[in-house]
């Protein structure tokens, strides 16, 4: 209230009714790297946005990638040999695993069409240059998606203005825009990003 002209951002993994008025961006917390987890993120994001939280995001690629070898990844819990329930990723070699690279690229593609585009995690590098070199498929796909996100910024900014002026949400269930279409009601793995882009992530 003392700085009404300031735009705030509060990135948090939890919130409460009406916390969106305080610049809250919710994210799904420290998730682990698996195809199933990535698919579930679509439902989680739609549920949050339908609950009135217009800004939602996730850890692209999963926060945790490994399962067995977490003690060697430099976390502060490395001296405790007790298995950690949360360290459940499917990729012991992290970015060196081509399976993880494919998952990461697909998750990255989904992230382009979220209110906040955010790659974050522990136990493996996530910078683009760790996924190959120019001319190689994983690297090139990531670069193209970064460029696409930048091209979408005027559209994203316009939709952000609608959140303020019209109580809008960027990540939209198909029920919002196609309420009369019974097929749309049955689709939980697609969503609208604003009013012009239909998104169906590869999961």
Role assignments for model-derived ranges:
Residues 1-203:
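Catalytic-domain carbohydrate-binding cleft regions of carbohydrate-active enzymes
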């Amino acid at each position: 209230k003392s700085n009404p002209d300031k735009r705030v951002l509060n990135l948090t993994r939890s919130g409460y009714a009406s916390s969106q008025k305080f610049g809250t961006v919710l994210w799904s917390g420290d998730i682990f790297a698996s195809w199933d987890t990535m698919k579930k993120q679509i439902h989680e994001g739609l549920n949050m946005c339908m609950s009135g939280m217009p800004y939602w995001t996730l850890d692209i690629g999963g926060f945790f990638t490994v399962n067995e070898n977490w003690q060697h990844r430099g976390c502060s819990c490395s001296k405790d040999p007790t298995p950690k329930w949360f360290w459940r990723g499917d990729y012991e070699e992290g970015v060196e695993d081509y399976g993880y690279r494919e998952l990461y690229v697909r998750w990255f593609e989904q992230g382009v069409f979220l209110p906040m585009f955010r790659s974050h995690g522990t136990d493996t590098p996530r910078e683009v240059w760790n996924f190959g070199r120019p001319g190689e498929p994983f690297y090139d796909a990531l670069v193209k998606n970064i460029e696409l996100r930048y091209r979408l910024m005027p559209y994203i900014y316009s939709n952000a203005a609608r959140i303020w002026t019209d109580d809008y949400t960027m990540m939209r269930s198909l029920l919002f825009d196609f309420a009369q279409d019974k097929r749309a009601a049955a689709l939980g793995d697609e969503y609208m990003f604003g009013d012009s882009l239909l998104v169906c992530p590869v999961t």
